[in-house]
UniProtKB/Swiss-Prot annotation:
It catalyses: guanosine(37) in tRNA + S-adenosyl-L-methionine = N(1)-methylguanosine(37) in tRNA + S-adenosyl-L-homocysteine + H(+). CDD domains: TrmD-like. InterPro entries: Alpha/beta_knot_MTases, tRNA_m1G_MeTrfase_C_sf, tRNA_m1G_MeTrfase_TrmD, tRNA_m1G_MTases_N, tRNA_MeTrfase_TRMD/TRM10. Belongs to the RNA methyltransferase TrmD family. It holds the Pfam family tRNA_m1G_MT. It comes from Acidothermus cellulolyticus (strain ATCC 43068 / DSM 8971 / 11B). GO terms for cellular component: cytosol. It comes from the Bacteria. Homodimer. The gene is trmD. GO terms for molecular function: tRNA (guanine(37)-N1)-methyltransferase activity. Its main location: cytoplasm. This is tRNA (guanine-N(1)-)-methyltransferase. S-adenosyl-L-methionine binds at residues 116, 140-145.
Length: 286
C-alpha cells in the first residue's frame, strides 16, 4: 500500500518508523511518502494561511499550496500507473472512523491524507479535489485537536495493521475489539496468581471450546456495559438466546451500579467536587 501524507509538520510522522509499521515499511509492505505543504509556496515566508473571509477568529489554510501539492500527489500516482488515491481529510466535522472503515481503507492500493491546521483548509480545496479523486472527511472522535497529524497517525496505524504481513499472527486481528462487532474481552498471561489475583480457571483448563465460549461471553458482557449501541447494531440472530440474556443481565447490573451513590466524602463524590475545566479553544481538524 502507498500512503501520501501532506502536512506542514512532516517530522510529526517519525513514529511511523517504529514498531510494526516501521518493520512493514522496511519490508516494502507499506510505502509512506511525506509532503511538506510549505514546499509548494512561492513567497519568502512560505505562507500557508490567511485571514478568513467573513471575519472571525483564527486563520484558514490557503488553497494555492494545497492545490499544487495534491496535483503533485496525483501526478506521482499517474506516473506509477495508479488511479488517483483516495484522499482522507481528518476533521471533527467528518464521518466517525470505525473498524469497518479501516477495513475498507485497507483494501485501497493508495491513500492520501491532508492534515489541516488553524481553522481548517479552504473549502474550495476539497471541492476541487473531488473533481479528480475520491475524498472522505473522517473524524476519530467527538473532540478537537490542534491539527490533522495525530488523527492521521491513528488512521494509518488502524489501516496498516490490517495489511497482510504487518501483524505477526493475523488471527489476532480477527479477535480485536470491533472486528466481530464486539469489544474484546480481558486478556491474561503468566503468572497464574499475581498479588492475590488469579487467572480465571477456565483459561488454565486446556478446554479450547470452553475457553472460546468464555471469551465470547466476556466480550458480550463488556460490550453490553461499555458500548451497548454496538450490540444494538448487530444483525438479527447474531446472538443466541443465552447470549442475549447475558447482555441483558450485564446491562441491568451496570445500571444498578450507576444508580448507587458513592459514600459521603468518598473520592470523586459530588461533595468533594472536581475542579472545573473548560474546553480547549484550539480549532482544527482532527
Amino acid at each position: 500500500m502507498h500512503v501520501d501524507i501532506v502536512s506542514i509538520f512532516p517530522e510529526y510522522f517519525r513514529p511511523l518508523e517504529l514498531s510494526l509499521i516501521g518493520k512493514a515499511r522496511a519490508r516494502g509492505v507499506l510505502d509512506v511518502h511525506l509532503w511538506d505543504l510549505r514546499d509548494f509556496t512561492h513567497d519568502p515566508h512560505r505562507t500557508v494561511d490567511d485571514t478568513p473571509y467573513g471575519g472571525g477568529p483564527g486563520m484558514v489554510m490557503r488553497p494555492e499550496p494545497w492545490g499544487e501539492t495534491l496535483d503533485a500527489v496525483r501526478a506521482e500516482a499517474a506516473r506509477l500507473g495508479v488511479d488517483a488515491p483516495l484522499l482522507i481529510v481528518p476533521t471533527p466535522a467528518g464521518e466517525l472512523l470505525t473498524q469497518r472503515a479501516a477495513e475498507r481503507y485497507a483494501a485501497e492500493p493508495w491513500l492520501a491524507f491532508a492534515c489541516g491546521r488553524y481553522e481548517g483548509i479552504d473549502e474550495r480545496v476539497l471541492l476541487d479535489a473531488r473533481r479528480h479523486m475520491r475524498v472522505e472527511e473522517v473524524s476519530i472522535g467527538d473532540y478537537v485537536l490542534a491539527g490533522g497529524e495525530a488523527a492521521t497517525l491513528v488512521i494509518v496505524e488502524a489501516v496498516a495493521r490490517l495489511l497482510p504481513g504487518v501483524v505477526g499472527n493475523q488471527a489476532s486481528v480477527l479477535d480485536d475489539s470491533h472486528a466481530q462487532g464486539l469489544l474484546e474481552g480481558p486478556a491474561y498471561t503468566k503468572p497464574a496468581v499475581w498479588r492475590g489475583l488469579e487467572v480465571p480457571e477456565v483459561l488454565l483448563s486446556g478446554n479450547h471450546a470452553a475457553i472460546a465460549r468464555w471469551r465470547r461471553e466476556q466480550a458480550i458482557r463488556r460490550t453490553a456495559v461499555r458500548r451497548p449501541e454496538l450490540l444494538d447494531a448487530l444483525p438479527p440472530g447474531s446472538l443466541t438466546p443465552h447470549e442475549e440474556a447475558l447482555a441483558a443481565e450485564a446491562r441491568l447490573h451496570a445500571g444498578r451500579s450507576a444508580e448507587t451513590p458513592p459514600p459521603a466524602g468518598a473520592a470523586g463524590s459530588q461533595a468533594e467536587g472536581p475542579p472545573g475545566t473548560s474546553p480547549s479553544d484550539a480549532a482544527v481538524a482532527h
